[in-house]
Amino acid sequence: MALIRGLPKKPLIALSIFLGVLALYLFTLAPSITQRHFGADSAELAATAHTLGVAHPPGYPTYLLLAKAFSLVIPWGGVAHRINVLSALSGAGAVVLVYFTCRLFIDRTFGDSQATSFRASAAATIAAASFAFSPLLWSQSVIAEVYSLNALFTGGVMLLALRWSKAPGAGFWPLLTAGFLMGLGLGNHLTLVFVALPLTYVMVLHRRELTPVVIAKLLGALILWLSVYIYLPIRASANPPISWGDAANLEGFLWTVSATPYRGLVFGLPVADLPGRLVEWADVLVRQFNALGLFMGILGVWRLRVSK
């Protein structure tokens, strides 16, 4: 209940956003396997989930288990189509979390008065819609991929961290739940580890509120849900049709979870190539929200600084 009380009011707006975005994603959902929208791994992920195998490093155990569950629960379409529904739900959920995060941030920064409520809801809705229609999120929400689910986990951790930072004395359940989502989300995609940096920063800002017991519980929640990686050696031992590496032994397990074959793609970029890569990233960002969207974002940061 503490979590619910901490969120902005007007849940009907959030529900409307979720249903509208979900309808859009389901309407444009890929009917089966596709390599469009950067979906080169879609066939492998769907087949691995269906057979409960071990996907390419880092293994993606959280995604595989959820995808398998969706393939069993959704009553229509083929296996691949059912798994695509997981991406649509995850993407729509991530959009709603953007709405909640914006509302919470606006309410706690500028006040939750009758005069500002409408403007706050409008601003949060525009932000959520911009995220929903961004080409990358939309494309990853209609195919079998891990990225919309990663967006959902990222949004959940950030919202809970913001909720706790705005009222650290109100209880530690938001922080502990963030640890829970962090551990579970790392079983979906390792890039979630980068969210640990701002989360740690928030904790340092409010370190007086953190007792050894709370820190122990937070680490416990993280470790508990990192245990989802136990799936890999268990299933590798069963010799499924698809099994990358040999996660049944320690060396193969570490090779898989550390994504050893792909480390060079993350940390192997020569320093001389970094400026060009930054330009490419900036171009991707502009194409998601266009120049007007970026201008509005910069304007919002300026307005926030002025208000302080």
Predicted regions and their residues:
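Transmembrane-helix motifs of polytopic, lipid-linked glycan transferases
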Residues: 85-113, 155-160
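Hydrophobic, aromatic-rich transmembrane alpha-helices
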Residues: 287-308
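Transmembrane-helix signature of polytopic, membrane-embedded enzymes
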Residues: 14-17, 98-133, 169-170
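Membrane-interface transmembrane helices that cradle and orient dolichyl/undecaprenyl
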Residues: 106, 110-118, 141, 157-175, ...
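Membrane-interface alpha helices of multi-pass inner-membrane proteins
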Residues: 48-51, 127-129, 173-188, 200-203
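Aromatic- and kink-enriched transmembrane "portal" helix at the membrane-lumen/periplasm boundary
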Residues: 26-27, 64, 76-84, 109, ...
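Transmembrane signal-anchor helices characteristic of membrane glycosylation enzymes that use polyprenol
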Residues: 8-38, 47, 131-133, 189, ...
